[in-house]
Amino acid sequence: MGGFFSSIFSSLFGTREMRILILGLDGAGKTTILYRLQVGEVVTTIPTIGFNVETVTYKNLKFQVWDLGGQTSIRPYWRCYYSNTDAVIYVVDSCDRDRIGISKSELVAMLEEEELRKAILVVFANKQDMEQAMTSSEMANSLGLPALKDRKWQIFKTSATKGTGLDEAMEWLVETLKSRQ
């Protein structure tokens, strides 16, 4: 039986793991999301200086997930990790109205990179459990997402600490990746 599912997986995705980058400004919740996806619970995190890389299995699919630090001094190095990326999870702090413009600038610059031309974009409007959180449509407009014409993208309301919205986002990502094969 296991061989049957392995052959289905191989026919859909080949034998390689899907490569996903988790990007966003510092404090957005990237590392919390990574470990919530990997172990299913919130773990204590510290600011990421450099990167974390983990293999995440979701719905029997393996993803190599790279969580890159979001501090100003680290962001220029994001491009070193773009090669062979299947999808980008872009995490935005829904409560950080002061830096939504910076988040948009970083997103736009990233999406202009040739190596990410075919990468699927999933935006996590994170910290939706907070009272002052922007709505997902407000965030989509602030980030300029409706203007993206030649890219498959979707935005999801998430709370990394509560775990809400993560399954829906990952379901969409898996289905979208499958449809590209």
From Swiss-Prot:
Transmembrane segments: none
Residues at which Mg(2+) binds: 31, 48
Membrane topology recorded in Swiss-Prot or TrEMBL: Peripheral membrane protein; Lipid-anchor
Sample GO molecular function, one term: metal ion binding
Glycoprotein as UniProt keyword: no
Sequence positions that bind GTP: 24-31, 45-48, 70, 126-129, 160-161
Reported tissue expression: Detected in heart, liver, lung and liver (at protein level). Detected in fetal heart, lung, liver and kidney. Detected in adult heart, placenta, lung, liver, skeletal muscle, kidney and pancreas.
GO CC entries: cytoplasm; cytosol; Golgi apparatus; Golgi membrane; trans-Golgi network; trans-Golgi network membrane
Biological role: GTP-binding protein that recruits several effectors, such as golgins, arfaptins and Arf-GEFs to the trans-Golgi network, and modulates their functions at the Golgi complex. Plays thereby a role in a wide range of fundamental cellular processes, including cell polarity, innate immunity, or protein secretion mediated by arfaptins, which were shown to play a role in maintaining insulin secretion from pancreatic beta cells.
Known partners and oligomeric status: The GTP-bound form interacts with GOLGA1. The GTP-bound form interacts with GOLGA4 and RGPD8. The GTP-bound form directly interacts with ARFIP2. Binds to SCOC, preferentially in its GTP-bound form. May interact with UNC119. Interacts with ARFIP1; this interaction directs ARFIP1 to the trans-Golgi membranes. Interacts with ARFGEF1 (via N-terminus).
Family: Belongs to the small GTPase superfamily. Arf family.
Protein name in UniProt: ADP-ribosylation factor-like protein 1
Species of origin: Homo sapiens (Human)
Encoding gene, per UniProt annotation: ARL1
